[in-house]
């Protein structure tokens, strides 16, 4: 089974829960909520709606998976998961948590009392990417049965077990400021299908600025085999995107704010707005119409 959702609510909860049946709760990374609040989240969601939970940063960033202190915070996360009926708890370590701390991670995962929880771990940073480190990590995660979390456009998980958990952070130079093209989502589908099996569920969580749109398009592709139109087409598509910022605005501001967004020139061709605006004069524009006069495609 493939499950699709977003990291946090990019739109209102009602609209989100009408579209998806999965969300990763991110606010728990910054503050442990009251149980009464958590119960309300569960009660207000549809019965078949699934929560996953991101563990508080004290576990990973402050205590760096060191026993005792990290274990205490882990125990505090369990009632949150239980009251949400969440079966997955995500631990995300920072890029400063490098492979030389693997022993601490192994001891932590061996020591936690998971009960019904599946604990998954997202490593961050380039130090985890060389083959020797990946093989060592695979051996440890398999031994403690902790699925590895990655962005599949950067690297595939070294171990999944019964759950593959993927988090998409954006692929551009500014990462989060990114929109996935139909071509990229088609490749994502290929990756996801290669991980899915009768014994393994695949969770796909989008965590980029256009996460709601991208996750919706990916869900539609999974269900129908086709992508819905991204926007209007041709000049109308450009107008639609240009209308999303305030004017007057400089070229550099426009490029920074919305240059990463995709334009559909026709049914077969998507380009980023920044490609169309690259050669327009560097000046202040009073409105979208002034920009359109300078654009050729």
Short names for language-model regions:
Residues 1-233, 244-245, 264, 286:
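Residues lining hydrophobic/aromatic ligand-binding pockets adjacent to catalytic sites
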